[in-house]
Structures are given as C-alpha cells and as structure tokens.
C-alpha cells in the first residue's frame, strides 16, 4: 500500500481525490458538495475539458446535468476525421495538469471502469509526489437501481430500466479496484455513506473514520452471483409511490388567457 505520499496530506495540497462507482452510486452527489457557489468555471480549450477552480481545490468536468464529472468531458475528437483527443484521454490530461497544483476531485463511470489508464495517471502523479486517493463505492444492487430509477422519474421518465446495462458497468469498477489493491495503490472501499464520510474527513484534515477499509478487496465471486440474479430480471420499474411523489407535475400557468372571451 503506497501510504508514504498520503500520510502528511492536507486538503489544498497537490493530490487527486478520485471517486469511483457505477451509475447511481452517488459519486456526483459527493463531489457536488465541494463545488461552492463562487467556483469559477474554466476550460482547457486544447483538450476540450472544463473544470472548476474552487479556490482551495479543483473539480474536473461539468455538473450542470446529473451525469457530470469526467463523464461530461468531451475532448476534441472528431469521429469523421479520426483526429483529436478522446474524452477519456482529455480527462487524464486535465488531471495531470491540475492535481500537481492543488487538491483535485475527479469522478466518472467510464473512468472508474478502467485500471490501466488510472494506473498511468497514478504513476505520472507519483513523479511529482502527488498522492492519488482512490475511493471506490460499494453499493447493493437494489440501492443502485432505486437511485437510478428515482433520478429518471424526477426527469419525467418512468419507463422500465435495463438491469443488464448497469450490472455490466458495475463489475469493471470492482475489477479495476481489485487490480489496484494488488498493485499496492492507496484504495478505500465501502458503502456510499462511508465513502462520503471519509472524503469529508480528508477535506477537513481529520483522521479517516474508516481507515480499516484501506486496501479492502471486493468479493468478485459474491458479486458475480448477485449480478446474475439481476441479469435474469431483465428490467426493473419504479414503484407507483415513487412516480406519485417524484414525477414532474404538469403546469397550467399561463393557460388562462387562452380561454378568456
């Protein structure tokens, strides 16, 4: 476990806080807490990547939509010409520029599913003694699907959700964590609430509440069995209670004038 660079870390110092998890695991929710209203949105035009300068720290990506962070990085790649920088590469470059300056938050589903690119970033940051904090969210499938369904219902979509699509993205996140632990990277793995608490500890320079979870490996055998159950379900649907409470209500303001004689 590469703790040497992490032990003396103070929030605001150079460093990367990378939060990983599947759709609906709460990655963006955690990061949004650390984007103050006065944050200045900036952009690396050469790599097509936006980030927030929050004074003491940076946040990579955009957060105007639910799917933000690194998933909102567009890069400069033109599929018609095959030229430019792909979104994943652009995110890596942005992290490489920002994290050695001051604490940088980065999260995204796609970035979280790969180990090779993350290890490359880790090794590159290590050259400048920049610590890489790898936070991986462990969420029960039911909570993940409930979270995604709620988000969809709030946006006006009450259609059934494919269980296969999300389960497919979940396993690579855990597989990359498994490789990271084996490679000796600093990792911590726990439920969303636990990860949120530990990130807050780091931000406020407190000892980590759940330091015993550092280096914890995922149980991929158990995960595969649970994933198969959800694969077999095919789809899940929002409850009627969820729809009644959260589905956007139609508005009638401004219609009265049409009916006046």
Swiss-Prot record:
Keywords: Host-virus interaction, Inhibition of host innate immune response by virus, Restriction-modification system evasion by virus, Viral immunoevasion
Catalytic activity: 5-hydroxymethyl-dUMP in DNA + ATP = 5-phosphomethyl-dUMP in DNA + ADP + H(+)
A GO biological-process term: symbiont-mediated evasion of host restriction-modification system
Purpose: Phosphorylates 5-hydroxymethyluracil (5hmdU) into 5-phosphomethyl-2'-deoxyuridine (5- PmdU) on DNA as a step in the pathway leading to thymidine hypermodifications in the viral genome. As a final result of the pathway of hypermodification, 5-Nalpha-putrescinylthymidine (Nalpha-PutT) substitutes for about 50% of thymidines in the viral DNA. These modifications probably prevent degradation of viral genome by the host restriction-modification antiviral defense system.
Family per record: Belongs to the thymidylate kinase family. 5-hmdU DNA kinase subfamily.
Name of the protein this chain belongs to: 5-hmdU DNA kinase
């Amino acid at each position: 476990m590469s703790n040497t660079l992490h032990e003396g870390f103070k929030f605001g110092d150079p460093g990367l806080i990378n939060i990983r998890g599947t759709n609906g695991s709460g990655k963006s929710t955690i990061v949004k807490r650390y984007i103050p209203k006065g944050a200045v949105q900036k952009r690396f035009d050469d790599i097509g990547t936006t980030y927030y300068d929050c004074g003491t720290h940076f946040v990579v990506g955009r957060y105007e939509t639910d799917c933000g962070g690194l998933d909102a990085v567009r890069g400069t790649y033109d599929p018609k010409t095959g030229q430019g920088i792909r979104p994943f590469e652009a995110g890596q470059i942005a992290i490489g520029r920002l994290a050695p300056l001051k604490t940088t938050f980065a999260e995204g589903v796609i970035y979280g599913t790969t180990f090779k690119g993350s290890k490359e970033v880790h090794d590159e940051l290590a050259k400048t003694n920049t610590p890489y904090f790898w936070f991986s969210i462990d969420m029960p499938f039911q909570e993940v699907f409930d979270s995604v369904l709620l988000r969809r219902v709030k946006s006006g979509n009450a259609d059934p959700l494919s269980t296969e699509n999300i389960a497919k993205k979940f396993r690579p996140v855990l597989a990359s964590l498994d490789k990271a632990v084996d490679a000796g990277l600093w990792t911590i793995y726990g439920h969303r609430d636990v990860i949120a608490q530990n990130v807050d500890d780091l931000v406020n320079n407190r000892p980590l509440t759940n330091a015993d979870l550092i280096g914890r490996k995922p149980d991929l055998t158990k995960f595969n069995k649970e994933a198969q159950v959800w694969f077999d379900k095919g789809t899940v649907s929002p409850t009627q209670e969820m729809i009644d409470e959260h589905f956007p209500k139609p508005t009638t303001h401004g219609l009265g004038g049409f009916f006046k004689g």
